[in-house]
Amino acid sequence: MLQELKGRDYLSLKDYTKDEIKALIDLAVELKGYHKQGIRKEILAGKTLAMIFQKSSTRTRVSFEAGMYQLGGLAHFLSTQDLQMGRGEPISDTARVLSRYVDGILIRTYAQAEVDELAKYADVPVINGLTDLYHPTQALADVLTIVEHKGYLEGIKLAYIGDGNNVVHSLMIAGAKLGMEVRVATPKGYEPQEQIIKMSMNFAKENGGKIILVNDPKEAAEGADVLYTDVWASMGQEKEAEKRKNDFQEYQINDKMLELADKKAIVMHCLPAHRGEEITHEVMEGPQSVVFDEAENRLHAHKAILAALL
């Protein structure tokens, strides 16, 4: 299965089958095990990754850089200031040039169309490190974390409470393909994109999953195995922050919300978190929080993607 992924792009989990996603999860578990035992597996010795960042990041940058190093490879960080792409060079030219230098390209940017165009013209695998539409590398770390703490994915009830953003788009696709019940609670007007809803529902039908959309966060949280949230205002939405705070007041993951979930529910957040807004400090630091395990798993999920594709 993993051999079939060699040379592939990782733009969205919609492009990956259930078995392929499971294979990546299994590889991440294996690589994490080696790391914990202090065993160095230089699977990517001599390989180089170019990392294009038009959006700043802590976890994505450090986890991919550390991941390449741990697998014996090298990562080059390229900000907007480092690239001619920001000065008018077409994405197609950048893709062709970088393909002559490196073995893979990671890009974190705003428009999904930029990632798709980069992949179209690149001769090496392109990895989507985040766009306004998708966050597929985060989603892989998320399902890895659920497997670690719950032992299974099929039938898991995940309640995402908050903004219908790129994170939940990728969670819906991953959950649908893996047979999970993904409940999404947003205020009216903040729902996931219609195309993502339809796509995810189709994937759910094919794989025994379920996608449920509601406006009542308590309805979503009732009996859930996983409570998941993200910031209410994403990067680029700073001007909307105050309005969003008002609109999302009832969507905070707090002790009362946690009481509605299953007694053994886990709490997840992709970070960075605004404590006291979408999640309380008490819940984030509480015994049911796996937020920092989830953050750690970015490293191992990303290593699995790199090892499989490069």
Ranges and model annotations:
Residues L71, Y101, Y121-D123, L178, ...:
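Short, structured coil segments at secondary-structure junctions
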Residues K264-A265, L271-L310:
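Adenosine-phosphate binding glycine-rich loop
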Residues R96, D103-A174, H269:
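Anion-binding alpha/beta catalytic cores of soluble intermediary-metabolism enzymes, centered on
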Residues T48-Y101:
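Active-site cofactor/substrate anionic-group-binding motifs, chiefly glycine-
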